[in-house]
A protein has these predicted regions:
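Positively charged n-region of N-terminal signal peptides that target proteins for export
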Residues: 1-4
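Lipid interaction determinants
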Residues: 10-11, 16-165
């Protein structure tokens, strides 16, 4: 009897997955400027108030990905000069230091060509308080096809990304 109840409860959702009737992923309309975002980008620099950002050091590293289904992910961290853990597991202080300045989140994105902004709709983040909070960035593509993102709330700073793929 218990097996029959489990089968009745699970059968409809599983059938949808097996037969391809499950809810499709959100498809973004990628036209015009939005298509220029698609691909893999490497962080070139972070400038804050016309100076290199001290939080990330002189040579921060990072990647950002935009795909044709409207999904994106980003990771940014300080340069490689951070100390390694003394043991196999970090001490509380080592763990805190490892997370300092590390940014990682994923979600979907939308492009507003008229406003020349891209919005990252965060669905997951290393920083729990940032989940569900949108990030709006003004964008421009320079003549060498680098992507420059400027936070709307801090227009004196910007991130420059170089296309890899």
């Amino acid at each position: 009897m218990r097996l029959l109840m489990i089968t009745i409860i699970l059968a409809p959702p599983m059938a949808g997955l097996i037969l391809g009737h499950a809810k499709p992923q959100t498809q973004a309309t990628q036209s015009g400027e939005a298509k220029r975002f698609l691909g893999t980008w490497r962080l070139v620099s972070i400038v804050s108030n016309s100076q290199m950002s001290p939080v990330f050091g002189p040579n921060p590293v990072g990647m950002i990905y935009y795909d044709g289904t409207g999904h994106m992910a980003v990771q940014i961290m300080p340069d490689g000069s951070r100390p390694k853990f003394a043991g196999s597991a970090p001490t509380p202080e080592e763990a805190k230091l490892a997370l300092t300045g590390y940014i990682a989140y994923f979600g979907t994105f939308t492009v507003d060509e008229k406003a020349r902004t891209v919005t990252h709709h965060r669905e997951g983040s290393l920083t729990p308080g940032m989940i569900g909070i949108d990030l709006v960035r003004r964008y421009e593509f320079d003549p060498s096809d680098r992507l420059i993102l400027t936070p709307v709330e801090a227009p004196a700073g910007h991130l420059t990304w170089e296309r890899l793929l």
